[in-house]
Design a protein with these regions (language model features):
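A short acidic, Gly/Pro-enriched loop at the edge of an enzyme's catalytic core
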Residues: 140-152
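A short glycine-rich, Lys/Arg-flanked "PGG" loop and its adjoining helix->strand segment in the class I
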Residues: 165-180
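Conserved Class I S-adenosyl-L-methionine
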Residues: 9, 14-25, 29-32, 65, ...
Length: 301
């Protein structure tokens, strides 16, 4: 629907040009940016291949041996009888890495806007596990028929949402009294060395069309969440990467949703040589990620 709206507006603008009407070029540029970003995200998240490349780098080279997904699971404080919803589940890694820790008497609904992602998650978890169900929907329009939940999880999801406030308000509607919302993000220092690396090779490269942490990040997340939730607290995941092999880092870079694939293929050999040299003695990458833990505001209307 969003893409159809953007494309209709572009057609209307083209018609205005042909009729020699005044064109709002600022609005036009915003729409072009939105079109490029949305199509990029759609291509990136049709299935789990690109997201797996990003997760793989963290799995191989994180200094903290606990691991991101086991740590997230610990913050969830899951216990018997809980009804849980994950928004934007991706390939289901949060659950495949924690299956043995989950009690038997719980129900977990995995959701994603991408049917391809859900297929990958179902395949990874196993479609026969009665604790799990899989639903495709946009988190801006959470179906009321799903019922209410003790816990809602949004792992690195909110900064992709067009209307974060609307998503938060929808979450409050499906949380039970005393229910919790766990949403992860990162800050301005997160993976900064990777961006500096590619820009030292070609300053035109940007690994993200937007600075996602400016949309929803560690620095501004409390202000964004506070109108909808109470007792909003931030917990950092203490970690860093020491990358000692070029290929996983290159795969990570190529999987990002920026413009790198416009500039790297023609000079791939030179870029690979640069990354290989940087990783020979261990390439340090800062991680600045964590979670906001929120409780429902009972009187929100």
């Amino acid at each position: 629907e969003q893409m159809q709206l953007v494309e209709k507006t572009l057609k209307d603008t083209a018609q205005a040009i042909s009729e020699e009407h005044t064109v709002d070029w600022s609005r036009m540029l915003d729409l072009i940016h939105l079109t490029v970003m949305e199509k990029s995200l759609k291509n990136q998240y049709q299935n789990a291949s690109n997201i797996s490349s990003r997760i793989n780098l963290h799995s191989l080279y994180s200094v903290n041996q606990e691991g991101w997904f086991p740590w997230i699971c610990q913050q969830c404080q899951i216990h018997e009888g809980m009804n849980i919803l994950e928004l934007g589940c991706g390939d289901g890694a949060l659950w495949t890495q924690n299956l043995s820790k989950l009690p038997g008497n719980i129900h977990i609904t995995l959701s994603d806007i991408s049917e391809g992602m859900l297929r990958d998650a179902r395949r990874a978890i196993g479609g026969e596990d009665p604790r799990f169900s899989f639903k495709a929907f946009d988190c801006h329009t959470i179906p009321p028929r799903l019922g209410t939940f003790d816990l809602v999880i949004a792992n690195h999801v909110l900064f992709y949402c067009d209307d974060i406030g609307k998503v938060c308000k929808n979450v409050t509607k499906i949380l039970k009294p005393g229910g919790r919302f766990l949403c992860s993000t990162y800050g301005s220092r997160h993976m900064r060395e990777v961006s500096l690396l590619v820009q030292s090779f070609d300053e035109r490269i940007a690994l993200s069309a937007d600075k996602l942490y400016e949309r929803f990040g560690r620095e501004n997340g409390t202000d964004i969440l506070s109108p909808y939730f109470q007792q909003v607290t931030w917990k950092s995941y203490e970690d860093e990467l020491i990358v000692t092999d070029a290929e996983p880092l290159i795969s990570y870079i190529l999987s990002c949703h920026g413009n790198q694939n416009q500039y790297l293929p023609d000079r791939y050999k030179d870029f690979r040589a640069l990354v290989k040299k940087k990783t020979e003695n261990g390439f340090h990458i800062t991680k600045d990620a964590g979670v906001f833990l929120c409780e429902k505001v009972t009187n929100l209307k």
